[in-house]
C-alpha cells in the first residue's frame, strides 16, 4: 500500500474552484480521488486563513462564526485544519502566515510518518525548499496546480505535476 499525505494551500485552491463555478475546493472528493486503489492517505492538512474583522463587536462575531463554520466543514471532509490568523498591516492591508504554517506542519508530519508521497495542492515557490527537503529524505512530492501558474522552482523540486483543472473535471468541481 502506498502512503500519502495531502497538504492543501486552501486560498488559491478555492480561487481556482470559484473560477470554475464551484463554491469551494472539494477537499473530500479530491482526497478520495488521490486515495484511489492501494493508496492510504494518512492525513489531509489544510490552511484556513482567519480574516481580521472590523473593530465592532458584530463584525468580530460574524467573522468568528464564518471561520468556525468553514473549519467544521473541512474537518467533516476529513481534513486537519491549520489556523492562520491574518494581521492588519499599517498600510491597511493584511498579512497571514498560511504558507509557512503549512510548510511546518507538512514537513514535521512527513518526517514523523514517512509516507512515500506528499500531494501538495499549491503553486507558490515558497514551498520549493520544503519539497527539496522531503526529497532529501526520500519522500516524493506530487504538486497539484495549474501548470501555467506553477512557480518554476517548485516545478523543478517536484516529482510530478498534476493539473488541478483535470482533477476538478474528474471530481465534478464545476466548469
Predicted segments with their positions:
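Nuclease catalytic cores that cleave nucleic-acid phosphodiester bonds
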Residues: 62-175
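Domain-level signal for Mg2+-assisted phosphodiester chemistry and nucleotide/NA-binding surfaces
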Residues: 1-98, 140, 149
